[in-house]
């Protein structure tokens, strides 16, 4: 039985981590569907914590084999606010912020925006490092990916 089970709905916890900002970063996610858990992770040499948070969400949605109802839990206010509050305005403003500056990480925001149209996504914020089992596992996966990349 999966640790995060809700019948016929994918539950995912995502997290990004960075050693230095910018620096070596990793992302991790755990997806659960009908009692089966799947762990995914990856790392990059020169990145930021926000890029890794976005990558975790992107890779989570890319891992889905067909259109799904999915709830994604993140501890990133950047991701949560971006997807729920800022994205529509960025798109309407030609991918510029309210201050008329280029949106940071535009490439990843555009990819995430495209992927969210293929699924029924609910975004939920969870406090990081507060003992939440899913968030702790995603954080562990992100940091393990960094360790594997650096050989430490």
UniProtKB/Swiss-Prot annotation:
Pfam families: RNase_H. It is found in: Cytoplasm. Its main location: cytoplasm. Residues 6-147 form the RNase H type-1 domain. Mg(2+) 1 binds at residues 15, 53, 75. The keyword DNA damage does not apply. The keyword Nucleotidyltransferase does not apply. Endonuclease that specifically degrades the RNA of RNA-DNA hybrids. Monomer. This is Ribonuclease H. It comes from Francisella philomiragia subsp. philomiragia (strain ATCC 25017 / CCUG 19701 / FSC 153 / O#319-036). The lineage of its organism: Bacteria, Pseudomonadati, Pseudomonadota, Gammaproteobacteria, Thiotrichales. The gene is rnhA.
């Amino acid at each position: 039985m999966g640790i995060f089970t809700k019948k016929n709905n994918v539950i995912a916890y995502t997290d990004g981590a960075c050693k230095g900002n910018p620096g070596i970063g990793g992302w991790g996610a755990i997806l659960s569907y009908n009692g089966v858990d799947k762990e995914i992770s990856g790392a990059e040499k020169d990145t930021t914590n926000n890029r890794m948070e976005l990558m975790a969400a992107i890779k989570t949605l890319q891992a889905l084999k067909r259109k799904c109802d999915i709830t994604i839990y993140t501890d990133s206010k950047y991701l949560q606010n971006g997807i729920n509050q800022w994205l529509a305005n960025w798109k309407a403003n030609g991918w510029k912020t309210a201050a008329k500056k280029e949106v940071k990480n535009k490439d990843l925001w555009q990819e995430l925006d495209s992927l969210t149209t293929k699924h029924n996504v609910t975004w939920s914020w969870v406090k990081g490092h507060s003992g939440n089992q899913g968030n702790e596992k995603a954080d562990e996966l992100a940091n393990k990916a960094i360790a594997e990349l650096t050989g430490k």
